[in-house]
Regions:
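Conserved micro-motifs of the catalytic ATP-binding
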Residues: 14-19, 58-61
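Conserved catalytic submotifs in the C-terminal HATPase_c
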Residues: 20-23, 42, 47-57
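Short conserved segment of the HATPase_c
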Residues: 109-122
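Short alpha-helical Gxxx[C/S/T] motif in the catalytic ATP-binding
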Residues: 136, 140
Length: 171
């Protein structure tokens, strides 16, 4: 898994990621990933609250890469979130953009800058005994940006928030 992750990050970094953009509904992708990860979510001890609109939020994205972004971010919450707390995942239209916000309470105070968190192999102190390559956020950021989107991380004490934005598809 580490080798595969490294391969993905380096491809994204040097612009050799092959994208298959098509019109995808971001809401449907989030629902699909939520379903695929339902066992992990259930076992995490964290209450996940999904606030998803009934309307489609279509963007021109690579469905597989975008699912990977959502997977990495949701799995991170199950791994590093504090048990007994809630995680909020919201998709919404914001002007000409589709915005997906994920926020949760970290099991440990995050004494690390948002920039450092997306560097390769950087993991918060608390994650030393958690499985993972340390590339989850780096891959999520790379796959977001290579598709013309932005991924912003905000850290405030133990509150962790990720905001993803992509241009909405006209129509």
């Amino acid at each position: 898994e580490l080798i595969e992750d490294l391969f993905e990050v380096s491809k994204a970094a040097n612009g050799t990621v092959v994208l298959h953009p098509e019109e995808v509904d971001v809401v449907s992708l989030l629902k699909q990933v939520r379903f695929e990860l339902s066992d992990k979510i259930e076992a995490s001890g964290i209450q996940f609250h999904f606030d998803l609109p009934n309307e489609r939020l279509a963007a021109s994205l690579d469905g597989q890469k975008t699912c990977r972004i959502f997977e990495n971010l949701l799995v991170n919450i199950t791994k590093y979130g504090m048990k007994g707390t809630r995680a909020y995942i919201k998709a919404e239209k914001d002007g000409e953009y589709v915005q997906v916000t994920l926020r949760n309470i970290s099991a440990e105070e995050l004494k690390i800058s948002p920039e450092e968190l997306t560097e390769r192999f950087v993991r918060g102190d608390a994650s030393r005994n958690t499985e993972g390559s340390g590339l989850g956020l780096a891959i999520a950021r790379s796959f977001t940006e290579v598709q013309g989107g932005t991924m912003k991380i905000e850290v405030e004490g133990d509150l962790f928030r990720v905001i993803l934005r992509w241009q909405l598809k006209d129509g």
